[in-house]
């Protein structure tokens, strides 16, 4: 599948009412505003991989449809009864405790069983202190390039201490945002202060 499509969907960026249409597509007139039919992420990923970021936020109704698509390799677009055949590998990413969501009735146990073939647990950033400065330097370099700067800024000792003292509850995304803001605001080659 490495030569096949990799399609992503950030489930946190969509309202629950839009997730099903994004995943499975829709027919013209399926709902208000559906002026034309649209291919969903499952069809776009046919033969390849579909990455569902923040999979724990998907509503139960859409989870049921995902389960059927995984088990049977087919689904219907929103507003259609015509089955669409797909061969898609699903990768889910989440900060949520999916077994806990299953116990609370907010995630389907059988979908978790189907998706949990191989689970990779990435510890929170606060448990990977050695990664913090490396990631911060990477994000600073990328942001400097985006801003058209010749050299990426470095971090002062105090800024480095701040990076390591902070618990990073938002993990890598929060670190990236903090560093990008610091680079944007910094007009010298050294970042001296971080807003954390």
Model-derived features: positions:
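Loop/turn-to-beta-strand initiation segments
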Residues: 46-49, 65, 86-91, 108
